[in-house]
UniProtKB/Swiss-Prot annotation:
It comes from the Bacteria. Forms water-filled channels that favor the permeation of cations. This is Porin PorA. GO terms for cellular component: extracellular region. InterPro entries: PorA (IPR021424). Residues 265-288 are annotated as: Disordered. The keyword Cytoplasm does not apply. Pfam families: PorA (PF11271). Its main location: secreted. Belongs to the PorA family. It is found in: Secreted, Cell wall. One of its GO terms (biological process) is monoatomic ion transport. Residues 1-22 form the signal peptide.
Length: 413
C-alpha cells in the first residue's frame, strides 16, 4: 500500500511541477487569443465642431445666423454661408463579433455614427460607417485574405451618396493591438484615408492604476477622391450611389462662391487645368473653380499592453476643400488652420473628439478582466502548483526511500 501511495505522490508532484512551469512558458502564451464574443461601445460627449450642410448648400439657403451676412445674399452665396460653426456633434461606435468566427479567426463589425445633437433622428445623422474586418485570433492582426468591407453613408455631407467598398485586404491594426504590445510603431489603418501608416509609441502612462502605452499618429492632408475612386472601381463597376459619393468630394463653383479673389482666382482655375471648348462662355472675373476634399487627423490612442485593449482615444478630424496638395498642406499649417477654424470657408467637417468617461471605464474593465485571467494562469496557479508539487514529490520520495530501507533491513534478517 505504501508503495502505491509513494508512487502516486511522486507522479502527482512531478505533474504539478511540470504544469507550473508549462503554464507561464507555454500554455499562457498559446492561450493569448481574442475571444469569440467581443462586444464594446465607445463614444464621445457632445463637442463643438464645424460642419458643411450639404442640403442647405444644394438649396442655396444659408444656415441659421448667416442669412444677413453680405456674402450670404444674392445669387452667388459663398460656401461659408452653409457651414455651421460651433455645432454640437457627437460620435459613437459599437463593435461586436460576427460570422465568420471560429477557433482561428474572429470577424469584427464596427458601426460608427457621427450625429448632431440639435436634431432628432434620422435628420441628425452626419455620417455613418459599417466596417468589417477579420482578425487572426492568435496574432490579433487582420488576415491576409481580401475579406474586409466598408459601407459609408454621409447624408449631411452628401444627401444622395452611399458607398460600399470591398472586399479588400486590410493592412494594419485598428480596433485591437497585439496581446503583448511592444514599445514601437505599428501600421494603423484609417477608414477615411483608406490606407495604413505608422502610429508611433510615444511613452508610458497610467490609467486607473494600470500601465498603458500611448501612441500618436498624424495623417497629413490626403485627397479623398482618388483613393476612394480606386477602391470603388475595384469590382469594375461604379453604381449611381458611388458616383454621387465621389461627386461630393470634388465641388465646382464660381471663384467668388469659394471666396477666392484677385490673383488667387486665376491660380485656382488653372490648377485643375480646366480647359474650355471653343465658344464656351466664362466669367473672366469669377471662373469656375473645382476644389477637392482633403482629410487630416491627429490621433492618440492609449493601449493596455498585456491585453492589447485600447482603453482611451482622441481624434482631431478635419475635412476641407483645397485646389491641390500644395494648398492643402499650407491650409494645414497651424496659423492657417486656426484661421479656418475661427472663420470656416472651406471646411466640410471638423470635430475634435475624445472618448467620454464611460468609454474609458468600460474598456479598462475589459483590459483588467483580461489581465486577471493572465495573472491567474501565469502567476497565481503556478505559484500554488509549484510548491505543492515539490512538497508532494519530496514526500513521495521520502516514503519510497523509507520503504526500500525497510525492505533491505527485512531481507538482511
Amino acid at each position: 500500500m505504501k508503495k502505491v501511495v509513494s508512487s502516486l505522490l511522486i507522479i502527482l508532484g512531478a505533474a504539478m511541477l511540470i504544469f507550473a512551469i508549462a503554464l507561464p512558458t507555454y500554455v499562457v502564451p498559446k492561450g493569448k487569443v481574442l475571444p469569440k464574443d467581443i462586444v464594446s461601445t465607445t463614444g464621445t460627449d457632445p463637442i463643438k465642431g464645424n460642419l458643411l450642410d450639404a442640403s442647405a448648400l444644394a438649396e442655396g439657403k444659408p444656415v441659421s445666423g448667416k442669412e444677413n451676412l453680405p456674402e450670404c445674399r444674392g445669387k452667388d452665396k459663398q460656401v461659408s454661408c452653409f457651414i455651421w460653426k460651433d455645432l454640437e456633434l457627437q460620435s459613437q461606435r459599437f463593435t461586436r463579433a460576427q460570422e465568420p468566427t471560429d477557433d482561428k479567426v474572429v470577424t469584427l463589425e464596427a458601426g460608427q455614427t457621427l450625429f448632431r445633437t440639435d436634431r432628432q433622428e434620422p435628420k441628425n445623422l452626419v455620417n455613418a460607417t459599417v466596417d468589417r474586418v477579420t482578425l487572426d485570433r492568435k496574432t490579433q492582426m487582420p488576415v491576409a485574405d481580401p475579406v474586409s468591407t466598408l459601407d459609408v453613408n454621409a447624408p449631411a455631407l452628401n444627401p444622395n451618396g452611399e458607398a460600399a467598398i470591398g472586399p479588400f485586404t486590410r493592412p494594419g491594426i485598428q480596433y485591437q493591438f497585439p496581446m503583448g504590445t511592444d514599445r514601437r510603431s505599428y501600421d494603423y489603418f484609417d477608414t477615411q484615408a483608406l490606407k495604413a501608416q505608422p502610429i508611433d509609441y510615444v511613452g508610458e502612462e497610467e490609467q486607473d492604476g494600470e500601465k498603458v502605452y500611448k501612441f500618436e499618429q498624424t495623417v497629413s492632408p490626403v485627397e479623398l477622391y482618388p483613393r476612394l475612386k480606386e477602391q470603388l472601381e475595384a469590382d469594375g463597376d461604379l453604381s449611381k450611389a458611388d458616383q454621387s459619393t465621389l461627386a461630393s468630394l470634388r465641388l465646382k463653383f464660381p471663384a467668388k462662391v469659394w471666396g477666392i479673389e484677385g490673383a488667387d482666382t486665376k491660380s485656382a482655375a488653372d490648377s485643375k487645368d480646366d480647359k474650355k471648348k471653343d465658344g464656351d462662355k466664362k466669367d473672366e472675373k469669377s471662373p469656375e473653380v473645382e476644389l477637392s476634399r482633403y482629410y487630416t487627423v491627429k490621433r492618440t490612442l492609449w493601449v493596455q499592453p498585456d491585453t492589447g485593449v485600447i482603453v482611451n482615444g482622441k481624434e482631431d478630424i478635419w475635412q476641407f476643400y483645397a485646389k491641390d496638395q500644395d494648398e492643402a498642406d499650407k491650409m494645414a499649417q497651424p496659423e492657417n488652420r486656426e484661421k479656418e477654424m475661427n472663420n470656416p470657408k472651406r471646411t466640410a467637417l471638423y470635430i475634435p473628439g475624445a472618448w467620454n468617461d464611460e468609454s474609458r471605464a468600460a474598456q479598462m474593465d475589459k483590459a483588467k478582466e483580461g489581465l486577471k485571467t493572465l495573472k491567474t494562469m501565469g502567476t497565481t496557479v503556478p505559484w500554488i502548483l509549484g510548491p505543492l508539487g515539490l512538497l508532494l514529490l519530496l514526500v513521495g520520495l521520502v516514503m519510497a526511500l523509507k520503504r526500500r530501507r525497510a525492505e533491505r533491513h527485512a531481507n538482511a534478517l
